[in-house]
Amino acid sequence: MLLIDIASTSLNVGGTSSRLAKVARIAEPLRAAAPDPELVAIVVAWLSGELRQRQIGVGWATLRSPPAAAGSPALTVTGTDAAFSEIGAVSGKGSAARRRELITRLFAASTETEQAFLVRLLSGELRQGALAGIMVDAVARAAEVPATAVQRAAMLGGDLPTVAAACLAAGSSGAAGALDSFTLRVGRPIGPMLAQSAGSITDALERHGGATIFEAKLDGARVQIHRTGDEVTVYTRSLDDVTARLPEVVQATLALPVSDLVADGEAIALQPDGRPHRFQVTASRFGRSVNVAAAQAKQPLSVFFSDILHRDGRDLLDAPTTDRLAALDAVVPARHRVDRLTTADAAAATDFLRATLAAGHEGVMAKSPTAPYLAGRRGAGWLKVKPVHTLDLVVLAVEWGSGRRRGKLSNIPLGARDAATGEFVMLGKTFKSMTDAMLDWQTARFTELAVGGTDGYVVALRPEQVVEVAFDGVQASSRYPGGLALRFARVVRYRDDKGPADADTIDTVRALY
């Protein structure tokens, strides 16, 4: 299978807003790839906007100026995937130059359509509307099995490309059996359950219909912990094995009175007074090049267990939250458990939220006592409640959209005002929470503000439009000149009542950090 086949499919998928059409268009290359499990896994990953290698060390600076495109397509899917692996394996002195050389070679062999696809894939900007649910439906359609069976297998297998490869390789007669082979297995990570957002404590209580389990929401790193006998493995939220980097988590798990275990938890760096360090301090312990012994001595991590999915031969995924927490409390000491309160009283829950925030944490999780653990899914059984920060920032440029946003000026780079120079300092970009009406309005508005026309993918703007942006926090970032970036930024509204001189300053942002 050629790379152009997948690049063209991506274009076709992005060109329709119909869910059924997206599913049908993705199913076609999956059927064609079915005899080759490796090829299926690559196609599923790519059309989901992901690399199988996850990260290969290629950023925007490398992708910004690709070489002249090839005249005709010749690259294969497996050959391109192998090139990604080669690029990702480069390390040591001169590695940046070597990666640029390899990526330039790959792009020189790509047509314009293929180059556009590769840029979006490598930059994480492949927004064609093929979200996980659509990909599950496409795999189910290609394999002629129920989507619920694919979803369940992906939940337990922890990886949709692997599940799709096994399912499609088995053929129509063996696909169902292949899916049934994916069960909870200690040592094999599964997708973590995710939370929906609630607007307030009262909202969470109303949605859960009464008594709710409130837990402190720590601003650490999600970990999934597996133990079989004396062997412990630790995985990140994205299912990367980080066991060797987190000896504290391993030691705490080995101290538990269990033989085998699968648990959900949080690793976090705490200050001497028990308050959390900034998230970046915790995140620094997860780097691939970290000297673990030195890092542990400088900044040890603490681990807090919040859920248990398997214990000593008993699977607990389908058990209600109360049963899972009882199993957790029976083996995990209080010092390693997340603080929690079960109540139907809004005042008591609000006091718990305030105390949690005062302790330096993000907010609270509200969990339904009867909810099962929906691995890999964002269920209403878990709700997150946390304060929302907003800033008034200036739109510095805008990018043309894809998928349902095709033909609209969409993704906006955001800048805070530097009071000393009058310039604007970029803090990231977003298209989150933009309605269709907002996209229509800003396409017209930004066309008026465009500097040098609107033909390019990125359209430069006069820095005049102020936008109110909500975000979850500020983090350190080497990607932007100011050294800071907003976490999970989304648009609230455009502020036509404000000019660029009214925008928040970079000093205000630094104070939030």
UniProtKB/Swiss-Prot annotation:
SUPFAM superfamilies (UniProt xref): ATP-dependent DNA ligase DNA-binding domain, DNA ligase/mRNA capping enzyme, catalytic domain, Nucleic acid-binding proteins
Source organism of the structure: Mycobacterium ulcerans (strain Agy99)
Keyword vocabulary terms for this entry: ATP-binding, Cell cycle, Cell division, DNA damage, DNA recombination, DNA repair, DNA replication, Ligase, Magnesium, Metal-binding, Nucleotide-binding
Protein name listed in UniProt: Probable DNA ligase
GO molecular function: ATP binding; DNA binding; DNA ligase (ATP) activity; metal ion binding
Record's keyword annotation contains Cell division: yes
GO biological process: cell division; DNA biosynthetic process; DNA recombination; DNA repair; DNA replication
Catalytically driven reaction(s): ATP + (deoxyribonucleotide)n-3'-hydroxyl + 5'-phospho-(deoxyribonucleotide)m = (deoxyribonucleotide)n+m + AMP + diphosphate
Active site: 217
Record function comment: DNA ligase that seals nicks in double-stranded DNA during DNA replication, DNA recombination and DNA repair.
Keyword ATP-binding: yes
Binding site for ATP: 215, 222, 237, 266, 378, 384
Family: Belongs to the ATP-dependent DNA ligase family.
Main EC class the enzyme belongs to: ligase
A Pfam family: DNA_ligase_A_C
